[in-house]
């Protein structure tokens, strides 16, 4: 019959197109789909494509007023996941016109919006995204990037060192600033606000900013090195967040910080633009990420959240440690660390990378390894992450038996020893303990640190693992 035909039709008739050849401008997504019993994979894959682009559950007459072929998502390949019954990777291509330029928020609202509550799927996880250069060019990305940061700080050829000030809640501003000063004076490059330090009754943000700035200037004067403190500008409103960033700029400090998932991508991108315009570096904390990324069969993989952050903007981001107390398997972690730092990353399923990603010269982001690490981990961290990283030791600095400054000294000595050994061609993986032991002979601070933490290990299997290939 001619004209509009009402009724429900199968998704796969419109949205499953195995013959489709992807375009260079398409955004490509890899979803891990677990269909409900009785739902064929083609129907499930097509449903993902439909519900995250143009589709609705029934035919509507306004479909006739547009060109579905131009705007619809297409499921173009489905492959079973090895070792899993009834789980598939569905590849979906989205036309570029379906997204607003320069908006991570809009990209996520489409791709990971309502579709995650869809009844025909038992579970759904976004494993990876291929962002085309045409879309990347609409983002400003990190305010400065790795090279500019090194030039600003005048620090080359080694990872940077930081320390989160603990206890995270309850210190007064003056005592907090004192802890910052001691760590910076001892040899760290940065100290850091904890992610949940914003502006609470025991320490309002303005007081904290002032005392931390004092600590920075005092430590700089005494060490001759450039120092910084990640001043957390995260706030309840965007206006308040920018107000805090403005005050940081007026104090002349080098870096501010934001919790990008709890604060949201819109706020984060606004802050990144402000930081670029005003010469502030931007440190990003990923609080709430595990809510989204920890389950293997549902949610969004962190490599996607990391790509989104590079688009939205940030100069540092926490990225797991491989060796500390928080989640992170080595190959997977190194996969998204490369996605953060490098300009071109080849598809590599052994590291969980589903697509080749070309960043077309968008600046890189420094990965921050933090969480349960201490001096004995330094050889492994130096070997795994290389020079372009920040290693943040909170308890691993402040927990030193002699105090904060000696804790900082121990970290700096162990780092310099590892970098020196590596530059001399020694194998950090094999000789790490020996390198630290040698250095501790002439550094009593390091020897004391080794004595305290020599037996500490967080040995649990990672929850998020690679599929058997």
UniProtKB/Swiss-Prot annotation:
This is Ribulose bisphosphate carboxylase large chain. The modification N6-carboxylysine is found at residue 192. The keyword Metal-binding applies. It comes from Calycophyllum candidissimum. Substrate binds at residues 114, 164, 168, 286, 318, 370. Binds 1 Mg(2+) ion per subunit. The basic functional RuBisCO is composed of a large chain homodimer in a 'head-to-tail' conformation. In form I RuBisCO this homodimer is arranged in a barrel-like tetramer with the small subunits forming a tetrameric 'cap' on each end of the 'barrel'. Pfam families: RuBisCO_large, RuBisCO_large_N. HAMAP family: RuBisCO_L_type1 (MF_01338). Its EC number is 4.1.1.39. The active site is at 166 (proton acceptor), 285 (proton acceptor). The keyword Metal-binding applies. It is found in: Plastid, Chloroplast. The gene is rbcL. The modification N6,N6,N6-trimethyllysine is found at residue 5. The disulfide bond which can form in the large chain dimeric partners within the hexadecamer appears to be associated with oxidative stress and protein turnover. The record marks 325 as: Transition state stabilizer. RuBisCO catalyzes two reactions: the carboxylation of D-ribulose 1,5-bisphosphate, the primary event in carbon dioxide fixation, as well as the oxidative fragmentation of the pentose substrate in the photorespiration process. Both reactions occur simultaneously and in competition at the same active site. It catalyses: 2 (2R)-3-phosphoglycerate + 2 H(+) = D-ribulose 1,5-bisphosphate + CO2 + H2O; D-ribulose 1,5-bisphosphate + O2 = 2-phosphoglycolate + (2R)-3-phosphoglycerate + 2 H(+).
């Amino acid at each position: 019959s001619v004209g509009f035909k009402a009724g429900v039709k199968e998704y796969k008739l419109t949205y499953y197109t195995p013959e489709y050849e992807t375009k260079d401008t398409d955004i490509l997504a890899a979803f891990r789909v677990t269909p409900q019993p009785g739902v064929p994979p083609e129907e499930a894959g097509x449903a993902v494509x439909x519900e995250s682009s143009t589709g609705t559950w029934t035919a509507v007459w306004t479909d006739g007023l547009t060109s579905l072929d131009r705007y619809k998502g297409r499921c173009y390949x489905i492959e079973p996941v090895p070792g899993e019954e009834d789980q598939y990777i569905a590849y979906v291509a989205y036309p570029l016109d379906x997204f607003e330029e320069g908006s991570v928020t809009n990209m996520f609202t489409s791709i990971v919006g309502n579709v995650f509550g869809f009844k025909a799927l038992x579970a759904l996880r976004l494993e990876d995204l291929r962002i085309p250069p045409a879309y990347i060019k609409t983002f400003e990305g990190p305010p400065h990037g790795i090279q500019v940061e090194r030039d600003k700080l005048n620090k080359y050829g080694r990872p940077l060192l930081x320390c989160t000030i603990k206890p995270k809640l309850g210190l007064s501003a003056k005592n907090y600033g004192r802890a910052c000063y001691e760590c910076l004076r001892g040899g760290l490059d940065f100290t850091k606000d904890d992610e949940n330090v914003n502006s609470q009754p025991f320490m309002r943000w303005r007081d904290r900013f002032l005392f931390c700035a004092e600590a920075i200037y005092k430590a700089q004067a005494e060490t001759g090195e450039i120092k910084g403190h990640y001043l957390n500008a995260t706030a309840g409103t965007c206006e308040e967040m920018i107000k805090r960033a403005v005050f940081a700029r007026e104090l002349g400090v080098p870096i501010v910080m934001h919790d990008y998932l709890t604060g949201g991508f819109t706020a984060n991108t606004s802050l990144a633009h402000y930081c670029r315009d005003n010469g502030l570096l931007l440190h990003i904390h990923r609080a709430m990420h595990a809510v989204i990324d920890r389950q293997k069969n549902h949610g969004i993989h962190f490599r996607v959240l990391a790509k989104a952050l590079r688009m939205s903007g940030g100069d540092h981001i926490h990225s797991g440690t491989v060796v500390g107390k928080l989640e992170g398997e080595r190959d997977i972690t190194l996969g998204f660390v490369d996605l953060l730092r490098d300009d071109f990353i080849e598809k590599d399923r052994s590291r969980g990378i589903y697509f080749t990603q070309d960043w077309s010269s968008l600046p890189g982001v420094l990965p921050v390894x933090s969480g349960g690490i201490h001096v004995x981990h330094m050889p492994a961290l130096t070997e795994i992450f290389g020079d372009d990283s920040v290693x943040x030791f909170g308890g691993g600095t402040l927990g030193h038996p002699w105090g904060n400054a000696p804790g900082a000294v121990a970290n700096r000595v162990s780092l310099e020893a590892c970098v020196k050994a590596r530059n001399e061609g020694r194998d950090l993986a094999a000789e790490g303990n020996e390198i630290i032991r040698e250095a501790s002979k002439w550094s009593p601070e390091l020897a004391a640190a080794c004595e305290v933490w020599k037996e500490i290990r967080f040995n649990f299997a990672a929850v998020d693992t690679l599929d058997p290939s």
